Swiss-Prot record:
Binding locations of an anthocyanidin: H18, A386
Residues that bind UDP-alpha-D-glucose: A346, Q348, H363, W366, S368, E371, E387, Q388
Expressing tissues: Expressed in seedlings and roots.
Species the sequence originates in: Arabidopsis thaliana (Mouse-ear cress)
Entry annotation: catalytic residues: H18, D111
Protein family according to the UniProt entry: Belongs to the UDP-glycosyltransferase family.
Name of this chain's protein: UDP-glycosyltransferase 72E2
Disulfide bonds: none
Gene3D superfamilies assigned: Glycogen Phosphorylase B (3.40.50.2000)
Amino acid sequence: MHITKPHAAMFSSPGMGHVIPVIELGKRLSANNGFHVTVFVLETDAASAQSKFLNSTGVDIVKLPSPDIYGLVDPDDHVVTKIGVIMRAAVPALRSKIAAMHQKPTALIVDLFGTDALCLAKEFNMLSYVFIPTNARFLGVSIYYPNLDKDIKEEHTVQRNPLAIPGCEPVRFEDTLDAYLVPDEPVYRDFVRHGLAYPKADGILVNTWEEMEPKSLKSLLNPKLLGRVARVPVYPIGPLCRPIQSSETDHPVLDWLNEQPNESVLYISFGSGGCLSAKQLTELAWGLEQSQQRFVWVVRPPVDGSCCSEYVSANGGGTEDNTPEYLPEGFVSRTSDRGFVVPSWAPQAEILSHRAVGGFLTHCGWSSTLESVVGGVPMIAWPLFAEQNMNAALLSDELGIAVRLDDPKEDISRWKIEALVRKVMTEKEGEAMRRKVKKLRDSAEMSLSIDGGGLAHESLCRVTKECQRFLERVVDLSRGA
């Protein structure tokens, strides 16, 4: 039995916002750390963008049939509950695929919603890791909150007091995870279940770095603070986001940006699954028009239900010719000299790295946040769901690289949007944020440095050594050593 390199099996939950970070981690393990990587993804009806992305990854992709969850969840269930049911139902198919592999994996890496598959690590004698594609703050809250007494939880969720987290900034009631506010709902049990499962792995990989989250990361690495709850090694491996491929990307928005002045364009996007209501969409359009600033706006159809209702089905691609119908009458023609409206999808990483882009109105999804930081672009924070409120607090209050809507769940006025756009794009506060985010961009490059021994590189080297030692023990045992 001659095996020269470890084999990582990776299991991603559905949604491009989850698939992309898992794939990028796999590519990094393969290219920089000598792993053979197999990524398991769920088949989806989403066609063009995800299929194109998966076909260009350079790692082995194995598609699992997407389970039929009809009758297992209610239509109104939270997206996290739906994802959890899907992932749990997919474990038997994953087990069968791993069992049929000629070279059994050395390690199983699941993402934040894949903890039901951790049992397979023991079954097939693999190391196990949880990959948190979001940040250290989310990880800290996730593992700490389930261990609190009921009275302490109610001080936060009922009395609305800030939640104290060891070594970290307190979490305001307004920024807490929505799931914690509904303890009788399945989504609450899902978050608690996952949070309790993370420390049961052999290690936790988190998509951040020291300068991005100094307090939260220091606490997780300190055995007297959050490290006491984590119990296993925490590996900061960020920033992990899709690399920029401008030379390979053909999209008319990039041609339009080439004609604009430096740092003059505001980019607006709410991710692959975030949607606004019709009223919010209208107010945003009027706010943009009144600001008189250049913009690129990725528009998705409005929804009147959950702001994350499109998440599981979002495919990150395609066009819809009737997109202007969602906007105020005459908006496109009135702003045609300074605006570019894109139906449904645009090459975000390439846009945020473009010299013409000077601001980003974002839902604060972590992948989008990292792409903005890597591009050196300050933000307007409009969080919608999940941990995005905590992300917005980090960006605006701790790092000073974003301005934030006061309460996006309340009515949003066009005048507030206009003021925030002007603040970021034309005023001194925006210039100060731009300087800060460019310093963070430089620290991100240092974290990824191979020659300079950056934190992300060193963390993955530690994981590699652990897997290599484990593989050697397995080989020795198979030889009867």
